[in-house]
């Protein structure tokens, strides 16, 4: 196994099975963040993740963290909160604000550089990247974004500026996603937060099998149309 240098003249990726074991999942470096290359990466189960000043690094870890949306863990306190939620939740109303919120919400620094923001905004304009927004009146207080692959959603990042805002985004999205035929959410790498929400690890080969099946599936044509998903009770 060796790290592969990508060419700027080809969007081809090596097989994820050739990724390094340490650091887990590192597969390639270089290339660019063009829409064609990003879409090719997601179709192959690969995603970019790198620090400012570093070359673009491409990953496909084994195991892979996923969330079956019907297995989302909702605590009793969250259920009580959501029942009386003051938040309004929308889809694809403010993609730019959401990714900027994710970029600025990391005190320890972030991989969401200006180039990443611009790259995913292009994907959004092309109809591949999507956002969920959580509002308190007219203020954006949380949200999440990711990339659609048929009936699989590749979650990228989320942020929260008020109590339970990002959890509300995920809860409402999961309900909507399941209700329209969505099957699986890719969480990439398991951490304490995603594990507490019900995410689990599966072998990479299993994830790639799911991806190859689900990316050919279809949600309703109007699923990603900008709209309100949840409003607080009067």
From Swiss-Prot:
It holds the Pfam family Leu_Phe_trans. Its EC number is 2.3.2.6. GO terms for biological process: protein catabolic process. It catalyses: N-terminal L-lysyl-[protein] + L-leucyl-tRNA(Leu) = N-terminal L-leucyl-L-lysyl-[protein] + tRNA(Leu) + H(+); N-terminal L-arginyl-[protein] + L-leucyl-tRNA(Leu) = N-terminal L-leucyl-L-arginyl-[protein] + tRNA(Leu) + H(+); L-phenylalanyl-tRNA(Phe) + an N-terminal L-alpha-aminoacyl-[protein] = an N-terminal L-phenylalanyl-L-alpha-aminoacyl-[protein] + tRNA(Phe). Gene3D superfamilies: Leucyl/phenylalanyl-tRNA-protein transferase, C-terminal domain, Leucyl/phenylalanyl-tRNA-protein transferase, N-terminal domain. Keywords: Acyltransferase, Cytoplasm, Transferase. It is found in: Cytoplasm. Its main location: cytoplasm. GO terms for molecular function: leucyl-tRNA--protein transferase activity. Functions in the N-end rule pathway of protein degradation where it conjugates Leu, Phe and, less efficiently, Met from aminoacyl-tRNAs to the N-termini of proteins containing an N-terminal arginine or lysine. HAMAP family: Leu_Phe_trans (MF_00688). This is Leucyl/phenylalanyl-tRNA--protein transferase.
